[in-house]
Amino acid sequence: MSNALLLRKFLRQTATAVLLGTAVVGLSAIVACGDGKEAKHAKVPSGPMPENETWTGVYFHPVYGHLHMIEEGANVVGRWKRADQSKWGELSGTKGGNVLHYTWKEHTVGMVGASATTHGKGYFQYKMDKEDRPILDGQFGLRDDEVGNDWHNVKQARMTPDLKSIGGDSEGIKPGGF
């Protein structure tokens, strides 16, 4: 075999080994590290629920509309329809004192497929404002994040929650139902 053929064979084997080694190391880094981001969690202390107050009720936000919530033991479920009627959502979570940690889904009206629904986590802290009105002070995040977007609601007097009035599921949702 000539020196040129031996050199070409050596270079081809070396290049193949380097490419395979690089691919294995790169794939290992991707699998081991994921996307490198950790979920963001709320650091909100739980306190006692304000006297004579309950999570059950209807709350209002100018963008997210009316949020209907029902408390069942340690669980709270809710549904909302945006003020512009473009989306509706559902949440389910566990309360501890005046703090509720929940998971949520929001569905775009008239849209189907994977992009029609977004989901995430969030929290609410039940408080009384300066005028002694009950409010929900909280945030929600996308996917595994629990924070990132503010969501503040004022509890509406003399409104009864009706989960069945919102969304595409006539049965409503049950605690932990999604």
Regions found by a protein language model. Give the residues of each.
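Central antiparallel beta-sheet cores of small beta-barrel/beta-sandwich binding domains
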Residues: A42-D132, F140-F178
